Amino acid sequence: MTRKTWRNSILVLLLALTGVVLWGWRDFSRFSGAPLHVSAAGESVDIGRGSSFKEIVRQLRDQDLSTASPLYWRLLAVQMRVAGRLHAGEYATPAGITPRQLLANMAAGRVLQRNFTIVDGWTFRELLAALDKAEKLKHETAGLDHAAIMQRIGAAGEQPEGRFLPETYAYVKGDSDLDILKRAHVAMARTLDELWPGRDKDLPLATPYDALILASIVEKETGRADERAKIAGVFVRRLENHMLLQTDPTVIYGMGESYQGKIHKVDLTTDTPYNTYTRPGLPPTPIALPGKPAIMAALHPEPGTALYFVARGDGTHVFADTLAEQSRNVACYQLKKCSQ
């Protein structure tokens, strides 16, 4: 082989190697920036503690998120300087996410967060039922009675009703229902501590817990923002005048599971600790989980003279100063016997 032929052969080989390298780099670049094979929106990958990089890549391939060579994943991790720095946890793989974005999330520990919303007006039993259905949440309250649950969240001896602030709480896989309950309990206690000192003067409420009880009644009586303070005002004036509160939601709560969607006359006369038709003052505990607006209404009731109200049937209420006026309103809006 002549020297010229040798040089030509070397040149061809170098060109071939350059072509291979360029092709490989282009293919690698395409891999790092191309979306993963996500089959459904909301899919996720759960990386266990102590997983090696090789195991992570194998898991991605096993879930059909990637068919790329493990070498490409290794090169990308080295290029991003995240090799050996990937955190365990559940990571979202939404449509359009790229390998580069996924590794960046894993390196930063940006695990998938879910939200759980406690709805204003839920009872504690309804809250527990909703938690039981929450996905990716450890259910540690199973088999525990209410007293045991309160003890587990550091509130031993407290009645649970009303003690949890309706709000949206973020959680990640591995969190438990007890974690959410504890956060909601702390949030409610903090809210009462913040709002109680600024309450209106001379309210017939001795403690923040009294305010919580009244707020829970307001919460169950109306969902309208423009009526909360009005209804709170009615109840405050009735308390000041030593009148029975006579509010149906407390009766319903006291009936427990025997309530089947309708109150009968006998229910109003059957005494329970929560029957405000037979017992004076506030019931012994809240009857639901009041939201912050209802608590504000209880602490800042609207001034006025109304002592009664009745539902119109459209979500609003009509208010009355006297029993005679209330009787006419009941006949009109409840019995549909409006006088002309």
Regions found by a protein language model. Name each.
Residues 52, 129, 133-141, 151-340:
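Bacterial extracytoplasmic/cell-wall-associated proteins, especially those involved in peptidoglycan
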Residues 4-5, 71, 323:
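Short alpha-helical segments used as structural interaction elements across diverse proteins
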Residues 4-8, 50-55, 75-79, 88, ...:
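A broad, low-specificity signal for short, low-complexity segments enriched in glycine/proline
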Residues 16-19, 64-65, 88-90, 140-143, ...:
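N-terminal start-of-chain detector that recognizes signal peptides
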